[in-house]
Amino acid sequence: LRGDLIRLFQKEGFYFHAEKMIRKSPQLAAIRTKNHQLMHGSTKKDSSICRPGLADYILTFRNKGKNEVPIQNEIDFDNWCKIAEPAEYVGDIEINTLQRINDQLWMDIEEGDTISSFRKAKGEKDEKHMTPTQLTVIENSYLLWSNKGDTVLSPFGGVGSESVTSLKMDRKPIAIELKNSYYEMLKKNISNQMDLMNQTSLF
């Protein structure tokens, strides 16, 4: 639960900075999970079990002290004044992109835009991550909260969504993944991305 995560970070000295909600399709969730709580047929039997779909959330936290490497921006003052809602300074983003990213609700996320669709070739037995993060979500987060050349840590590396996006956006990925099958797929996805970029090493 988000509340538990917030309290955990606060206990370690962080303060809650912001949250971003990302709409997820309840229909796609019902198809994927076979959850009767999301199915229309359940309203005909006993709608007391029915519930809305669950959104994704990005929680951001800050710690005390000065940010030694500011995240720079290319937004002039006139354009800045046109933005109605509070917004963080960001780097190398056009004004319309900034307005979209700073909306409280990201409605333009394609649920199929995941690392699974990125892979050019996969075998029948390749590991399938059950809940891969949409690449646009990761891209938006990197635009707001990191510079090119920064090192990005993924403590739950999964199949490499964040690591692949790091490479695509000129960041340096460090990933941690305990499940061996996910780790092998993570390496494969990084290798595929490096081939696309004609790189021979991460750095």
What spans do the regions from the language model cover?
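Core catalytic lobe of class I
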Residues: 1-185
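S-adenosyl-L-methionine
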Residues: 187-203
